[in-house]
Amino acid sequence: MATIAIIDYGMGNLRSVQKGFEKVGFEAVVTADPKVVLEAEKVVLPGVGAFRDCMRNLEQGGFVEPILTVIQDGRPFLGICVGMQLLFTDSVEFGLYQGLNVIPGHVLRFPEGMRERGEDLKVPHMGWNQLSIKRRPSAFSDVEDGANVYFVHSFYAKPDEEGVVAATSSYGIDFCAAVWKDNIVATQFHPEKSQAVGLSILKNFALSKA
């Protein structure tokens, strides 16, 4: 049984996530086999690219049912970037596309014309930004309020229930930077690119029981 399975569905820099786990002393298997995902103790869903394409690849790769089974079984599950967005009901990127609907809510685009401190803000939101911690899953046990993490995204998730928001950040608007629901932790930012803070998240996720 693979302790940690990173889903390879053709969308994302999977090796960087795998190397992140290696840096904190854990082996993670990158797999395109739904059976390996189904048998894993912990599962990571990264994601880079368009929501529509990511969801299509999950479906075509046969990953949807294994993902839902892992989540329903209560096994630790980590979503990263678009991997977080896919957990929501739908996204308006390039139309309206259905997600996994594990966390009720919608994925929206940053509005045009945002300004902050008198400056126009460009989309995508790219670079380092601060977290405001709202709730603290075990994966965030070493993350300080105000910690800086690395983002690259034009869309953000808006949960129907505020209670699932683990952290927010601000870029013209306050937006959900991380969610926590039962055995699911998911981040809009990239822990594998967020240096010591991100590595602590990967380490504590690897140590988590649920």
From Swiss-Prot:
Coiled coil: none annotated. InterPro entries: Class_I_gatase-like, GATASE, Imidazole-glycPsynth_HisH. PROSITE patterns: GATASE_TYPE_1. It is found in: Cytoplasm. The keyword ATP-binding does not apply. One of its GO terms (biological process) is L-histidine biosynthetic process. The active site is at C81, H190, E192. Its main location: cytoplasm. SUPFAM superfamilies: Class I glutamine amidotransferase-like. Keywords: Amino-acid biosynthesis, Cytoplasm, Glutamine amidotransferase, Histidine biosynthesis, Hydrolase, Lyase. Residues 3-210 form the Glutamine amidotransferase type-1 domain. It comes from the Bacteria. Its EC number is 4.3.2.10, 3.5.1.2. GO terms for molecular function: glutaminase activity; imidazoleglycerol-phosphate synthase activity; lyase activity. It catalyses: 5-[(5-phospho-1-deoxy-D-ribulos-1-ylimino)methylamino]-1-(5-phospho-beta-D-ribosyl)imidazole-4-carboxamide + L-glutamine = D-erythro-1-(imidazol-4-yl)glycerol 3-phosphate + 5-amino-1-(5-phospho-beta-D-ribosyl)imidazole-4-carboxamide + L-glutamate + H(+); L-glutamine + H2O = L-glutamate + NH4(+). Pathway: Amino-acid biosynthesis; L-histidine biosynthesis; L-histidine from 5-phospho-alpha-D-ribose 1-diphosphate: step 5/9. CDD domains: GATase1_IGP_Synthase. Disulfide bonds: none annotated. One of its GO terms (cellular component) is cytoplasm. IGPS catalyzes the conversion of PRFAR and glutamine to IGP, AICAR and glutamate. The HisH subunit catalyzes the hydrolysis of glutamine to glutamate and ammonia as part of the synthesis of IGP and AICAR. The resulting ammonia molecule is channeled to the active site of HisF. Heterodimer of HisH and HisF. This is Imidazole glycerol phosphate synthase subunit HisH. It comes from Geobacter metallireducens (strain ATCC 53774 / DSM 7210 / GS-15). The gene is hisH.
